[in-house]
Curated annotation (Swiss-Prot):
Signal sequence, renumbered to the chain: 1-23
GO BP annotation list: regulation of vasoconstriction; vasoconstriction
The name this protein goes by in its record: Sarafotoxin-i1
One Pfam entry name: Endothelin
Lineage of producing organism: Eukaryota, Metazoa, Chordata, Craniata, Vertebrata
Post-translational modifications reported in the UniProt record: Different length molecules ranging from 15 (85-99) to 30 amino acids (85-114) have been found in the venom.
Organism: Atractaspis irregularis
Highest taxon of source: Eukaryota
Coiled coil: none
Propeptide feature: residues: 24-84, 112-118
Length: 118
């Protein structure tokens, strides 16, 4: 159901509720939920929709789910990419054999190119 859009999921729940009633009067709680549009949520559901961030022993800061990308950018420091190899120079043959060949293997072109003869 996570793949369905919110509107489609709500419509599906409405259809299931109406099919379960089968002509009987709806209980008051079900009617209230249908009239609210499912906006009422329990404490656990409301807490699940937030990201809790603890910064340097401060009090937790709650961020809503819609702001997760902005919050992640604001809270995460810029990171330098880790170097793939730790070779000091190109004369270190052992490092070149074990490290740089892997880099070439990962970054190589996946499509074979035809050999052109002159």
């Amino acid at each position: 159901m996570a793949l369905l859009p919110r509107l489609a999921a709500g419509g599906l729940l409405l259809l299931l509720a109406l099919a379960a009633l089968d002509g009987k009067p709806a209980p008051p709680k079900l009617l209230q939920k249908l009239m609210d549009g499912g906006q009422r949520r329990s404490e656990d559901q409301a807490a699940a929709g937030r990201i809790i961030d603890y910064e340097d022993g401060d009090e937790p800061v709650a961020v809503s789910v819609g702001d997760t990308k902005q919050a992640a950018r604001a809270l995460s420091p810029l990171r330098k990419p880790q170097p793939l190899c730790s070779c000091t120079d190109m004369s270190d043959l052992e490092c070149m054999n074990f490290c740089h060949k892997d880099v070439i293997w990962i970054n190589r072109n996946r499509k074979p190119s035809p050999i052109q003869s002159s």
